């Protein structure tokens, strides 16, 4: 195996191990020794890629952002907002890296970390979608996209945190759908509202859609 490929695989192994440890113990209680044991790598290999526990945490948080995936563009941007939230819901239930990144962002004991970046990045993405929705006439006149984006991100953070505590995310689909059913009527035009799909199971369908698109791209690249 080429050195570069081996280094990429080692870095990935360390991040997956760190995600597992951070998800289970939180940032403060997690130790480098725990992560080394979970990864099965040497201390030298770990420190080649990550300089500290904080560096590892930022690596996990960045990776969970990439793992969230990007919803394929929708003609209706309000639906794209909804799909972004529902895809995150599915990822939280299925992807340990996403769960670990969210736990780190929500961990009030992790005072050493800049936890606000995750929320700000998601808020910026939501604002762009809502700006596009407003340009297309999908939003009610009073809606300020940046304010609504912050509301959606903050409310969702609370809902997912409650779901994690109460059911280990097993009821997050339902809770997310309820949240969206309460928010969207105050955000979008009634003519748009009737077209929106807020079904709890939609997140899984979006994930399958993304996987199919990725596989098609890989096949196209292989045959080129």
Predicted regions located by residue number:
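Conserved phosphoryl-transfer catalytic core
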Residues: 64-67
């Amino acid at each position: 195996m080429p050195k570069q490929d081996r280094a990429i695989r080692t870095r990935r192994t360390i991040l997956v191990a760190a995600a597992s440890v951070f998800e289970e113990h939180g940032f403060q209680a997690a130790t480098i020794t725990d992560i080394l044991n979970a990864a099965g790598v040497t201390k030298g290999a770990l420190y080649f890629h990550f300089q500290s526990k904080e560096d590892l945490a930022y690596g996990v948080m960045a990776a969970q952002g990439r793992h969230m995936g990007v919803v394929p563009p929708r003609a209706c941007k309000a639906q794209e907002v909804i799909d972004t939230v529902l895809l995150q819901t599915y990822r939280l239930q299925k992807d340990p890296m996403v769960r670990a990144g969210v736990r780190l962002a929500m961990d009030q004991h992790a005072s050493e970390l800049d936890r606000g970046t995750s929320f700000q990045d998601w808020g910026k993405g939501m604002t762009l979608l809502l700006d596009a929705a407003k340009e297309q006439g999908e939003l009610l006149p009073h809606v300020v996209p940046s304010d609504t984006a912050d509301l959606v991100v903050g409310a969702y953070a609370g809902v997912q945190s409650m779901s994690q505590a109460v059911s280990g995310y097993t009821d997050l689909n339902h809770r997310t759908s309820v949240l969206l059913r309460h928010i969207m009527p105050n955000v979008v035009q009634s003519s748009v509202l009737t077209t929106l799909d807020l079904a709890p199971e939609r997140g899984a369908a979006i994930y399958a859609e993304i996987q199919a698109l990725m596989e098609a791209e890989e096949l196209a690249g292989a045959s080129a």
